[in-house]
Design a protein with these regions (language model features):
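Mixed-charge, low-complexity intrinsically disordered segments
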Residues: 114-158
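Short helix/turn-capping signatures at newly exposed starts of structured segments
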Residues: 17-129, 173-186
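Bacterial N-terminal signal peptides
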Residues: 5-14
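Intrinsically disordered, low-complexity boundary segments flanking structured domains
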Residues: 11, 140-143, 168
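Low-complexity, intrinsically disordered Gly/Pro/Thr-rich segments
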Residues: 156-171
């Protein structure tokens, strides 16, 4: 084996370990792992570092979270039984659409949508209509507004839809200038 091949093999092994290590904390967020495991993944996983500008000693920053093909800046605050995450990116219509698609890929479903001050409560609608009717009404509601209109979409894991205390709450906010993804893991 040539020296170049050996170096390439070692480098690719190191790179793949780094890449998978960066994803471990996000996979832990989505899993049923206890909050302590998530806190440990953030504080010792290597991707996050202590924020220098925060007053709190339990605030961590992430300069570049590759959420599928999107680049997000993140902050995390850790409390006793909760982890708060906030991710930001500049608003672009395609970025908003991709975030929605990626949240769905990760097993999350919309629970409530507010656009330009008007609200559609999916949980409530499901009590009075079939899932197909709710899907149709939701699409009509969303398409009523321009994509850059201020919006907030509440998400939960599909298996926790309708439960009073889900272990994961996600809120996708957009004001036409920035997109914020807030995640609370209990």
């Amino acid at each position: 084996m040539s020296r170049f091949s050996l170096c390439l093999l070692i480098f690719s092994g190191l790179f793949s370990q780094t890449t998978s290590a960066q994803d471990l904390w996000w996979q832990a967020i989505l899993s049923s792992a206890p909050v302590e495991k998530i806190q440990q993944a953030i504080t010792t996983g290597g991707a996050w570092y202590r924020c220098e500008t925060q007053d709190s000693t339990d605030a961590f920053c992430l300069d570049d979270f590759h959420y599928y093909h999107q680049h997000l800046y993140g902050e995390s605050t850790i409390e006793d039984r909760e982890v708060y995450l906030s991710f930001l990116t500049e608003y672009q219509p395609q970025s908003l659409s991709e975030l929605i698609l990626n949240l769905r890929k990760d097993g999350l479903v919309m629970q409530k949508v507010e656009i330009d001050g008007q609200q559609y409560d999916i949980s409530e609608a499901m009590r009075h209509a079939t899932p197909e009717e709710v899907d149709k009404d939701l699409i009509v509601f969303i398409n009523r507004y321009p994509q850059q209109a201020p919006r907030s979409i509440d998400w939960v894991l599909a298996q926790e839809f309708g439960t009073p205390t889900p272990r994961l709450n996600v809120m996708l906010n957009s004001d036409g200038e920035m997109i914020e993804l807030k995640v609370i893991r209990f």
